[in-house]
């Protein structure tokens, strides 16, 4: 169930939002687009610093999702990185890594310089 992984899902969506913008209002907007797609009411995780171990633990938890929920989560990730109409190289690399780790195809995305 999606509700069992709200915390790890929130962490990944929050990280994607933070990578996409330095402005907190834009991060919150991007995060909310992804959270709406994901479902439920996970709140954005404030990231003081990047922690690879925490990200790996979150992805380990998300690996247990059903294929349908995994695709919905990747779609939520895509909603975050596309919220501002631009896809940076860093956003693309991160979402591609998440999708690869979860064994799920990405929807069509094109990086913008």
PLM-predicted stretches and their roles:
Residues 1-113:
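Small-residue-enriched hydrophobic alpha-helices in membranes
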């Amino acid at each position: 169930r999606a509700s069992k992984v709200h915390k790890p899902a929130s962490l990944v969506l929050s990280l994607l939002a933070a990578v996409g913008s330095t402005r907190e209002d834009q991060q919150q907007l991007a995060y909310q687009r992804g959270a709406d797609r994901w479902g439920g009411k996970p709140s954005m995780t404030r990231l003081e610093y990047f922690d690879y171990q925490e990200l790996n633990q979150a992805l380990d938890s998300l690996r247990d999702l059903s294929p349908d929920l995994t695709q919905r989560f990747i779609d939520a990730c895509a909603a975050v990185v596309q919220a501002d109409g631009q896809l940076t190289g860093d956003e693309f690399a991160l979402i591609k890594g998440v999708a690869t780790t979860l064994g799920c195809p990405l929807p069509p995305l094109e990086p913008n310089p």
